[in-house]
Amino acid sequence: MKEWRREILGRELVVQHGKVAKQSSGAVLVRFGDTAVLATANISDKVIEGIDFVPLTVEFQERFYAAGKIPGGFIKREGKPSESAILSARLIDRPIRPLFPKKLRNEIQVIVTVLSADPNVPPDVVGIFAVSLALNVSKIPFEGIVAGIRIGYRDGQFIAFPTEEDIEKGLMDITVAGTKDAVTMVEGEAKEVSEEDMVKALRFAHSVIKELVDFQEEILSEFNVEKIPVVEPEPPEGLVETFNSLLDREELERRILVKAKKEREAALKEYEEKLLSQTAEALSIVDPEEIKPFVSELYEEAVKKTMRRLIVEKGIRADGRKPNEIRPISCEVGLFPRTHGSALFTRGETQSLGIVTLGAPMDVQIIDTLLEEGVKRFMLHYNFPPFCTGEVKPLRGPSRREIGHGHLAERALKNMLPPEEEFPYTIRVVSEILESNGSSSMATVCSGSLALMDAGVPIRKHVAGIAMGLILEEDAEVILTDIIGMEDHYGDMDFKVAGTRDGITAFQMDCKVSGVSDELLMKALMQAREARMYILDKMYETISAPRPHLSRYAPIIKVTKIDPDKVADVIGPGGRVIKKIIKDFDVKVEIDDETGLVKVVGNSEENVDNAIALIREIAKEIEVGEILEGKITRIEPYGLFIEVRPGKIGLLHQSKVGEDMRQFLKKVKVGDTIKVQVINIDDLGRLQFKRVKEESPQHGEVHNKRH
């Protein structure tokens, strides 16, 4: 067993190898502060045939014992990965995936298990460091060293590994990963920060990443691991030369420049099949399927080079646009009568339908994860059905990609929402992707913002998002605005920026090359800002402010405040009083027993108002001398029990009836109303009444005074 230690950012970073999980190809136990993770990396001996990608799976295992907790619910053990675990797995996957050899076809599984969790040192960020080491000490081919860090920005200062208070009171919460040379991955949110501050944050993050990478280099200098060879099947003799001689580059260029996505894909597929047939014929191969993998690879590379050359040399993109040109945009709101808010945002061949549903305060999402407990009142869910790309696939639960895209869009919008005190509704936004050709997560931000305003949610400003790309050659660099799927696939970087007219609210970047300079990143961010302003103008033209009224189908929520000491009176013995209010007025009621804040939800404004009036009446202090009207609930020889408010029952003694008791009892029965005056309240809060004479009691009638 070997152990290495180094102090970084005031915390001790400890790495152990050879102590646990020794049968794993690569395994390290990393402890940073009070957070400890075990990272393991293994590879299958078998090569998977017929695929054109690296078969990598990253799993992130949250163990509740790491935070000293037992899982909630009926089943007291961890089940399928939570959304937070899936997001953590994606966060680790993204910086390591580009560092595997492109031709590697053996299945790789990376597992990060959280053994101890410190809220101020995120386990997923430590996991990036641990996975990098586990892969490098394993036999798995891996070409680099990466590390990650979480950055906050508060009071003009950048903070590494910010506390929850720093995040809440600060302006930024981003996770950054990279190599010694450059930042390669960013994911996070901000409260309308400038492009300059974002670049400064990445620069600060990289200074810490370099120190973390340096520590890894020190550790790895003691290892000399033999990596397994990457098996690359040799093409038949003469195939490459034959293919290149048959390839008509002008014909390929014409097919790439077909504007519509489906037509372009069909044209390129047709030409690939033609080249496959011609190559097989030229090489006297009877079955073209024998050489299909080789031809497909050569063709893919030719398409990539041609598309990039068109952009760099001619400034023309596959759909005919210039590098900084945005596809045609259209916005619509108020599409459906029964939804609380709706919007359709279309950008070229990407289309998102945003739907807003307003719910009661009790509709919040309960959060009980490894490091978080509480409730979530704003949710954004992103759906990517197969028909949006014209494909046929089985419909299952949300994929990791759908969860990740929805999370990014949610972070982009959430800081524009009103506080709960101003708008007590639970808010759910659903984005249905109806068409997709690049940047559907940013289309979700736009449709979500439009739908929120259509629903009457008082968001402070519109938020728009744009996806940017980069083509980086030795002699040229071209930044692309509003990338399509093809440019995302063949480009060197894609980054998504969402924000208002005043700053960035969410940012995501993935770099396939060794990294980009601060100057180039700043240039790309400013180009993204121009695009964002253009989209925001279109959105403001469609709906410039939240609608003044909510949908008539949205629930009605009204809030009142009572004395916290009176909460028990409103609830009543065994909940009897509150249950009756809920049943009588067809409402939902939520009471905070610490603050006395009462929220009443219903579909009828009259019922909600009446319920609130009754709650206020119940919570109102009863004073000696006050005249009240109550209902007879019980008759005894010594007097009558009168309920003057729900749950508030007092005694009208026979001596206080004001006439002969036997004669009076002939005129009344249980359920009748009677007017009484409070003459005493004892130390236990028990009420004593005297009768206030009136002409005659109203049989069977109950008077509820409501204000």
Curated annotation (Swiss-Prot):
Keyword presence, Repeat: no
**Where is this protein localized, as stated in its record?**
Cytoplasm
Catalytic function, reaction form: RNA(n+1) + phosphate = RNA(n) + a ribonucleoside 5'-diphosphate
Q: What is this protein called?
A: Polyribonucleotide nucleotidyltransferase
> What GO terms are given for molecular function?
3'-5'-RNA exonuclease activity; magnesium ion binding; polyribonucleotide nucleotidyltransferase activity; RNA binding
Q: Which residues form the S1 motif domain?
A: 625-692
Keywords from the UniProt entry: Cytoplasm, Magnesium, Metal-binding, Nucleotidyltransferase, RNA-binding, Transferase
Major subcellular location class:
cytoplasm
- SUPFAM superfamilies recorded for this chain? Eukaryotic type KH-domain (KH-domain type I) (SSF54791), Nucleic acid-binding proteins (SSF50249), Ribonuclease PH domain 2-like (SSF55666), Ribosomal protein S5 domain 2-like (SSF54211)
The KH domain is annotated at: 555-615
Q: Where are the transmembrane segments?
A: none
Entries under SMART domains matching the protein: KH (SM00322), S1 (SM00316)
Q: Which family does it belong to?
A: Belongs to the polyribonucleotide nucleotidyltransferase family.
Q: What is its EC number?
A: 2.7.7.8
Q: Which cofactor does it need?
A: Mg(2+)
**Which NCBIfam families does the record associate with it?**
polynuc_phos (TIGR03591), PRK11824.1 (NF008805)
What highest taxon heads this organism's lineage?
Answer: Bacteria
> Does the keyword field hold Nucleotidyltransferase?
yes
Give the top-level enzyme category: transferase
Biological role: Involved in mRNA degradation. Catalyzes the phosphorolysis of single-stranded polyribonucleotides processively in the 3'- to 5'-direction.
